[in-house]
Amino acid sequence: MSVSRRELFTKFLGGKTAQKFIAPPYFCGEFNCVDCEAPCVSACDRELLSLENERVNFKFKSLGCNFCKECALACEEAGREVLNLKFTAKIEAKIFIDVHSCLAWNGTICCSCQDVCKFRAIDFLGVFRPSINQKCTGCAQCMEVCFANSIKMEAL
């Protein structure tokens, strides 16, 4: 596991690392959540959003995002533009497959992740060895159906 220079100096100098977060879909790139009552959080019927340190954060629980736009509409109605429909319906996160626990990687025929992905973001080498390609939107629908909980999400 490689350590970045920033992480090395932060540890060495006793500093705190910035908390990583996953921006939700339609994120404009800037936060304006100070004194906000977070209508986007309550608008998400799948409970995927939270407000932490005056930032809206995407957190996968048990259901993936269906890009219903309700969070962005609620944000715009509140006079904020943190979530705005002009921006991409993509969740900027790293989605990856834990090959040690993945059923397909370990010889069991399973393609539940590929079946549910409407973006065709999961490729298979034959019937085994799934991988996530560049079409991934970070919606986490594949995480929702993975029996072995082998699909993981990390902040970039």
Regions found by a protein language model. Name each.
Residues 1-156:
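Non-ligating segments of multi-cofactor redox enzymes
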